[in-house]
């Protein structure tokens, strides 16, 4: 009799899981192996009722361990700049000083990272002390700048709609004027007062991520007012401006392209009636970021058209300009030696508003028939040494300036005792070509992150295609030190420039306006303006400040015949709340 015994084993799955940001499931499987029992060698005798327990051999061979990780999708934590660093909505800077001066800056802002921003602001700067002019007379010398404005932006996905509106008021007094005898009715010490209202709107991108197409469309409008005090100046100048601009840019790998086009219309009213200027601008750029050289090249095209009322027909002039543009930076494998080449330029209209920004003492209602055109070229070396503690830039430059402005002054120098000697403090621009060769050096040294030393030196050689003095220095430079601490910050800087000269035209001796007779030129001496600033952070929101200017009390001039204040200072408070 044969006995057959079967044994069956089943291995049940065993699971384990672990949860540390992820779910882990581990499965092990075993496959049993069962073999047949060996038969006994002899026939057993069962009469003694003995029980036989046959031996059964079996083995278990586990399969290789298999582990499966099944991560669950987890939304990463995100934080925006505005959630991480929320600026306080209000900023105030207020101060006053001696001789009497004042400063005020106030900003109120609100920012929502998903909606947009809005900001309103007020700026004021004024000085009120009388200054003795070069004739030994103290006229009213009040000078003041005021601005009020608002700006806002609305986000539309990756694009933004922005707007800006503001009004400027710039007030000066002709304290450099003088008259021998009775100067009544000549406007001696009168006020030059300019108002400027502007509104602008743009829609588009910020041109930072060029992996997608970036674009911009912008519109601008403005109105300029002349409220100056002049005898018999009832129909005061007014000027309007309209402008439009469009730009598109895209990057492809290491390359990038951009195209820009713009249009400006400037029109005169009242005493400027019949004067207008149109400026069309187009610019093309191509850039490439290579390993050895990184460059941007292109060109700017301008069409400039001026029109003035005349008899028997209007006077019209049109000019076309092409200005090259280049930025080449070479990488020689070391941060301490980086050659570069730059070429650029600009076309600057010489309408009345632009001239008042260049020189506030310009003769009233002046509008020149050509724009100033600059072509600039620079070649040099730059780099960083000693783990970026020492930065330098050394270069030579050449500038060709067509229709450059040479500022002249007029003075009556009659020997007739019945005729008063008069200088009304008016500056008149005359255009001529100028070529400038310059040699420049700029150094910045940071031994530690909180301390900075800087030195700039610039030398100029002028080739003027006129006998008029250009009013520019042959040397200019500055040297300074600044410290930025956690509680205290301060800086000391000396601004220097060489002797400057302007042409003085003798109206009494001039008989032909095309050939003016020049008298002794006006000379501004070598100037050093020593400035000091100090900030003390009383708390995280309040800072006390002090600023000093012209502390060596030099005779300084920004405009000919108009000396600046001597040593002066301003103290006040800055607050965020």
Residue ranges and their predicted role:
Residues 16-82:
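N-terminal periplasmic/intermembrane-space "pro-region" immediately following the signal or transit peptide
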Residues 80-87, 112-115, 155-162, 206-214, ...:
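Short loop/turn motifs that connect adjacent beta-strands in outer-membrane beta-barrel proteins
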Residues 92, 294, 302, 307-577:
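Exposed, low-structure sequence patches enriched in small/polar residues
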Residues 127-130, 134-135, 139-147, 162-213, ...:
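Flexible loop and strand-edge segments within Gram-negative outer membrane beta-barrel domains
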């Amino acid at each position: 009799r044969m006995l057959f015994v079967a044994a069956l084993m089943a291995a049940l799955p065993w699971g384990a899981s672990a949860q540390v940001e992820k779910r882990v499931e581990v499965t092990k499987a075993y496959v049993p192996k069962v073999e047949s029992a060996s038969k006994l060698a002899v026939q057993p005798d069962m009469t003694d009722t003995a029980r036989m327990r046959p031996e059964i051999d079996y083995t278990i061979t586990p399969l290789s361990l298999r582990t499966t990780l099944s991560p669950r999708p987890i939304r990463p934590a995100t934080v925006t700049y505005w959630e991480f660093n929320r600026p306080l909505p209000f900023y105030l800077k207020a101060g006053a000083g001696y001789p009497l001066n004042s400063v005020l800056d106030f900003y109120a802002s609100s920012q929502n990272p998903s909606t947009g921003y809005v900001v309103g602001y007020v700026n004021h700067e004024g000085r009120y002390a009388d200054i003795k002019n070069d004739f030994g007379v103290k006229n009213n010398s009040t000078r003041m700048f005021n601005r009020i404005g608002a700006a806002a932006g609305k986000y539309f996905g990756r694009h933004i709609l922005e707007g800006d509106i503001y009004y400027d008021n710039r007030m000066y007094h002709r304290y450099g004027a003088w008259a021998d005898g009775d100067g009544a009715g000549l406007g001696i010490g009168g006020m030059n007062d300019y108002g400027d209202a502007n509104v602008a709107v743009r829609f588009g991108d910020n041109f930072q991520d060029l992996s997608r197409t970036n674009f911009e469309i912008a519109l601008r409008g403005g109105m300029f007012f002349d409220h100056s005090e002049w005898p018999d100046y009832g129909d005061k100048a007014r000027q309007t401006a309209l402008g439009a601009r469009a730009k598109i840019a895209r990057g492809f790998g290491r390359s990038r392209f951009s195209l820009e086009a713009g249009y400006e219309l400037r029109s005169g009213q009242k005493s400027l009636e019949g004067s207008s200027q149109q400026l069309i601008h187009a610019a093309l750029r191509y850039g490439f970021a290579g390993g050895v050289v990184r460059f941007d090249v292109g060109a700017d095209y301008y069409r400039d058209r001026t029109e003035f009322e005349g008899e028997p027909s209007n006077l019209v002039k049109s000019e076309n300009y092409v200005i090259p543009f280049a930025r080449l930076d070479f990488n020689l494998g070391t941060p301490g030696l980086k050659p570069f080449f730059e070429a650029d330029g600009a076309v600057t209209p010489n309408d009345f508003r632009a001239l008042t920004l260049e020189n506030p003492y310009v003769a009233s209602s002046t509008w020149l028939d050509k724009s100033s055109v600059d072509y600039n070229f620079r070649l040099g070396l730059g780099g960083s040494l000693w783990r970026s503690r020492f930065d330098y830039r050394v270069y030579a430059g050449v500038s060709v300036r067509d229709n450059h402005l040479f500022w002249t002054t007029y003075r009556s120098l009659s020997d007739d005792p019945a005729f008063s000697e008069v200088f009304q403090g008016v500056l008149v621009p005359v255009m001529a070509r100028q070529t400038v060769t310059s040699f420049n050096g700029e150094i910045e040294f940071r031994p530690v992150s909180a301390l900075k030393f800087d030195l700039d030196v610039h030398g100029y050689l002028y080739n003027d295609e006129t006998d008029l003095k250009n009013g520019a220095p042959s040397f200019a430079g500055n040297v300074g030190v600044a410290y930025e601490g956690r509680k205290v910050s301060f800086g000391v800087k000396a601004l220097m420039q060489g002797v400057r000269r302007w042409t003085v035209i003798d109206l009494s001796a001039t008989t032909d306006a095309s050939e003016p007779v020049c008298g002794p030129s006006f000379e501004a001496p070598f100037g050093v303006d020593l400035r000091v600033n100090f900030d003390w952070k009383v708390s995280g929101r309040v800072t006390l400040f002090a600023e000093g200017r012209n502390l060596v009390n030099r005779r300084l001039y920004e405009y000919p015949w108009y000396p600046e204040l001597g040593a002066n200072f301003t103290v006040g408070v800055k607050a965020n709340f």
